[in-house]
C-alpha cells in the first residue's frame, strides 16, 4: 500500500496538472503545520536538556539555568542556538589551546569548547551572581571542573566595582540575560534594576593568571569597547581570534571601531553564507551583528571557511618566533 502510494506520488510529480493539484493542496497544510510547530517551540520550553555532540560526548544544560538556550537545543539540536556563531567557534575549538568566554551566561560555549576539544582550557567570565550559579552547576554537571575556570567578575577597562543594569525578566525560571554595564543603554532608560559587580581588566587578570590566549568570545550587550580596551595588551601580544557581538547603537560603535582598527584587526561579518570582510569597519548594519575579529586577513572579500585565516595566523606566528 505504502509502495503504491509512493509510486503514484512520483508519477504525479512529473505530470504538470497533477503536480499543480497536489502542490496547491499541500501548501496550506504545510503552512499550518509550520505555524503550529513554531507556536509549540515558542510556548513549550525545555527546562534543562542534554544533546549528543558529533564527537559522541553528551552536553547537558542543568535545570533553571539557561532555559531559552536549553529549549533551542532541545528543539533543533546543536545548531538550534546561534548556528553561525556556534559553527565559527567550533572551528577554532578544534585548533585552540585556550578559550576565554566573556559574558559566558549559563556557559553554553564554555561547555561546548571543553567537550569539543579535550585539550582546550577555558576561562569563563559571568558577573551576574544568579547566572553565575547556573554556569557553575553546568560545569559540574558536565564534569569539567578542572578544565573550565569560572570567574564571577565582569571584564572592563577598569578594575574595581560598578553598577550592573539588569532588566526585569518577563517571567519563567530564566534570569534576564540582557544586562549590561553600559550606562548609556536601553536597560538604563527603561529603569532596569541595579546590582553591584566586581570588574577587572583582563590585562591585569592575566598578570595574576598567566596564559596564552588563542580565542576570545565577547557577548556583553554594548560593553564590548570597554572589554577590548581592558585586554589590548593581551591581544597585541597573543593576537587571538575574537568572536564578538556588536549590536547597532545610537553612538555608532565608534569606540569599538577605533580599538579594533588600532589593534590592526580585520573584522568579518559572520553570515550563513560565510565570512564577509567588513569595509571601513562598518558595525552599523542591523541584520549583521556577529563579527569575527581576525589578526590576519586574506585578499578575498568573502570566505567560505576559516582555514585560510588560521593558516595565515600560524605562518605569522612562526615568522615571529624565527625573528626572536
Locate the predicted segments by residue.
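Core alpha/beta nucleotide-donor-binding catalytic domains of modification enzymes
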Residues: 136, 140-171
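S-adenosyl-L-methionine
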Residues: 1-147, 187, 191, 209, ...
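Internal alpha/beta domain cores that form substrate/cofactor-binding pockets in large enzymes
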Residues: 200-206, 211-237, 243, 250-277, ...
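Short internal loop-to-helix segment that lines adenine-nucleotide cofactor pockets
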Residues: 76-100, 149, 161-163, 179-238, ...
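Short internal beta-strands
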Residues: 126, 242-246
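A short helix->loop->beta-strand "cap" motif at the edges of active sites that frequently abuts
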Residues: 118-120, 238-241
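Short, glycine/acidic-enriched loop or turn micro-motifs at the edges of active sites
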Residues: 104-106, 129, 155-157, 220-222, ...
Amino acid at each position: 500500500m505504502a509502495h503504491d502510494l509512493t509510486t503514484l506520488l512520483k508519477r504525479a510529480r512529473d505530470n504538470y496538472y497533477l503536480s499543480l493539484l497536489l502542490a496547491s493542496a499541500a501548501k496550506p497544510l504545510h503552512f499550518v503545520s509550520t505555524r503550529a510547530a513554531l507556536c509549540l517551540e515558542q510556548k513549550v520550553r525545555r527546562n534543562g536538556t542534554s544533546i549528543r555532540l558529533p564527537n559522541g560526548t553528551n552536553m547537558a544544560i542543568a535545570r533553571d539555568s539557561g532555559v531559552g538556550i536549553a529549549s533551542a537545543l532541545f528543539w533543533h539540536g546543536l545548531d538550534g542556538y546561534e548556528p553561525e556563531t556556534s559553527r565559527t567557534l567550533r572551528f577554532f575549538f578544534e585548533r585552540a589551546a585556550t578559550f576565554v568566554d566573556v559574558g559566558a551566561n549559563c556557559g553554553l560555549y564554555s561547555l561546548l569548547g571543553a567537550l569539543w576539544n579535550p585539550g582546550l582550557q577555558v576561562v569563563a567570565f559571568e558577573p551576574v551572581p544568579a547566572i553565575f550559579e547556573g554556569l557553575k552547576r553546568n560545569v559540574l554537571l558536565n564534569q569539567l571542573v578542572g578544565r573550565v575556570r569560572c570567574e564571577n567578575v565582569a571584564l572592563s577597562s577598569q578594575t574595581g566595582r560598578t553598577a550592573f543594569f539588569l532588566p526585569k525578566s518577563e517571567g519563567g525560571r530564566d534570569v534576564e540575560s540582557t544586562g549590561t554595564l553600559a550606562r548609556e543603554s536601553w536597560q538604563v532608560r527603561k529603569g532596569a534594576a541595579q546590582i553591584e559587580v566586581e570588574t577587572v581588566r583582563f590585562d591585569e587578570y592575566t598578570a595574576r593568571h598567566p596564559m596564552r590566549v588563542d580565542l576570545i568570545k565577547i557577548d556583553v550587550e554594548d560593553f564590548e569597547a570597554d572589554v577590548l580596551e581592558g585586554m589590548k595588551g593581551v591581544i597585541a601580544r597573543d593576537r587571538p581570534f575574537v568572536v564578538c557581538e556588536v549590536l547597532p547603537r545610537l553612538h555608532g560603535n565608534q569606540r569599538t571601531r577605533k580599538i579594533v582598527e588600532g589593534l590592526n584587526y580585520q573584522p568579518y561579518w559572520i553570515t550563513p553564507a560565510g565570512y564577509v570582510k567588513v569595509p571601513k569597519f562598518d558595525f552599523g548594519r542591523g541584520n549583521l551583528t556577529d563579527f569575527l575579529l581576525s589578526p590576519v586577513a586574506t585578499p578575498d572579500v568573502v570566505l567560505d571557511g576559516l582555514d585560510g585565516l588560521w593558516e595565515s595566523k600560524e605562518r605569522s606566528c612562526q615568522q615571529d618566533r624565527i625573528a626572536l
